Amino acid sequence: MNLKKFPRHALTFGPTPIHPLKRLSAHLGGEVELYAKREDCNSGLAFGGNKTRKLEYLIPEALEGGYDTLVSIGGIQSNQTRQVAAVAAHLGLKCVLVQENWVNYSDAVYDRVGNIEMSRIMGADVRLDSAGFDIGIRKSWEEAMADVRKAGGKPFPIPAGCSEHPRGGLGFVGFAEEVRQQEAELGFKFDYIVTCSVTGSTQAGMVVGFAADGRADRVIGIDASAKPEQTFAQIVRIAKGTAELVELGRDITDKDVVLDRRFGGPEYGLPNEGTLESIRLCARLEGMLTDPVYEGKSMHGMIEKVRLGEFPAGSKVLYAHLGGVPALNAYSFLFRNG
């Protein structure tokens, strides 16, 4: 496997820390050891997150190609768009963000706080669009790029989750290599890695990265899209392409991709009671915050899998905390009583 042949523009602090979730593990019976790898604090650029790791492999193309405007898309409370806005500000580039109405949630301040507030503060041209949630290339995003061209600019396209970009999975191939180095220092290997999945490139990169040591199917994706068939197909497709790019040496198949479909409801961006319970439990036992859209759902999935005995006793499970906490402010009504 060869990741080093791809240029990388450093946007993160370096390897993200791994630490034990001792109190949560004990609360769940103590037979499974839970750990977290903190992608949520991986950068000084507006709180960072998993997209910042991905952008390290996209930005070299933007800089080398003389692009002057980063154009990205997400929901109103998109973490991706906030991270793109931060990178643009850091590099002295312009930024246009399309924020679609992906979540069926009404709150008086939903489009004024959290991620979107930070993007505006960082100077991004934020454009609200009424289109609902879906996975793939969006018309509104293509129109935004056309607008930049008409104004004489040179737009660099960054799709939702970085996932439709050919190099969108590379960052999390690097994540797997980083984990292997940390495992050598820790003196043990993780039996399972739990991650949230929606647009697919995070899990796809992990699948390829851990396939290098035979652990592709030990990456457990927790669907948060509530459109798991689309998400699964996207993960497989991106993983196949990423495997070819990094010269993995074997094909990725459907059997390499594990996506748990039980925890994404009721729909994208809306938490269920299990999501909210898991957010509170993790926060109160570990002081580690998760959000209602992504990490609350993957945390719920991990907790339930422990409770149901789906991880064998003695397993060491690594929870990939991908970020997302800035969106909590947009859901303040749900937590008005804690």
Swiss-Prot record:
<dbReference type="GO" id="GO:0018871">
    <property type="term" value="P:1-aminocyclopropane-1-carboxylate metabolic process"/>
</dbReference>
<dbReference type="InterPro" id="IPR005965">
    <property type="entry name" value="ACP_carboxylate_deaminase"/>
</dbReference>
<feature type="modified residue" description="N6-(pyridoxal phosphate)lysine">
    <location>
        <position position="51"/>
    </location>
</feature>
<keyword id="KW-0378">Hydrolase</keyword>
<dbReference type="GO" id="GO:0009310">
    <property type="term" value="P:amine catabolic process"/>
</dbReference>
<comment type="function">
    <text>Catalyzes a cyclopropane ring-opening reaction, the irreversible conversion of 1-aminocyclopropane-1-carboxylate (ACC) to ammonia and alpha-ketobutyrate. Allows growth on ACC as a nitrogen source.</text>
</comment>
<comment type="similarity">
    <text>Belongs to the ACC deaminase/D-cysteine desulfhydrase family.</text>
</comment>
<comment type="subunit">
    <text>Homotrimer.</text>
</comment>
<dbReference type="InterPro" id="IPR027278">
    <property type="entry name" value="ACCD_DCysDesulf"/>
</dbReference>
<dbReference type="InterPro" id="IPR036052">
    <property type="entry name" value="TrpB-like_PALP_sf"/>
</dbReference>
<keyword id="KW-0663">Pyridoxal phosphate</keyword>
<dbReference type="GO" id="GO:0008660">
    <property type="term" value="F:1-aminocyclopropane-1-carboxylate deaminase activity"/>
</dbReference>
<dbReference type="InterPro" id="IPR020601">
    <property type="entry name" value="ACP_carboxylate_deaminase_bac"/>
</dbReference>
<dbReference type="Pfam" id="PF00291">
    <property type="entry name" value="PALP"/>
</dbReference>
<feature type="active site" description="Nucleophile">
    <location>
        <position position="78"/>
    </location>
</feature>
<dbReference type="InterPro" id="IPR001926">
    <property type="entry name" value="TrpB-like_PALP"/>
</dbReference>
<protein>
    <recommendedName>
        <fullName>1-aminocyclopropane-1-carboxylate deaminase</fullName>
        <ecNumber>3.5.99.7</ecNumber>
    </recommendedName>
</protein>
<dbReference type="GO" id="GO:0019148">
    <property type="term" value="F:D-cysteine desulfhydrase activity"/>
</dbReference>
<dbReference type="GO" id="GO:0030170">
    <property type="term" value="F:pyridoxal phosphate binding"/>
</dbReference>
